[in-house]
Amino acid sequence: MMSKLGVLLTICMLLFPLTALPLDGDQPADRPAERMQDDFISEQHPLFNPIKRCCDWPCTIGCVPCCK
């Protein structure tokens, strides 16, 4: 019974390696310096509304967050 579990575990590890799982290291929350830089760039954007703290429509030209 234990050898069958070992074989099954080995097959599963070969088919689904742990490196294939997405890691959360590439999330924006893990890169605060880049987030701050992105916010700074948005605040200088001509469509940025400083009162609402978002970009007026249309905001398809690199200005986030979008006012809706």
Curated annotation (Swiss-Prot):
Signal peptide (UniProt feature, chain positions): 1-20
Annotated S-S bridges: C54-C67, C55-C63, C59-C66
Alphabetized UniProt keyword annotations: Cleavage on pair of basic residues, Disulfide bond, Hydroxylation, Neurotoxin, Secreted, Signal, Toxin
KW Ribosomal protein (keyword) present: no
Compartments, as annotated in UniProt: Secreted
Main location: secreted
Residue ranges annotated as propeptide in the record: 21-51
Family affiliation: Belongs to the conotoxin M superfamily.
Protein name: Conotoxin ArMMSK-01
Organism of this sequence: Conus arenatus (Sand-dusted cone)
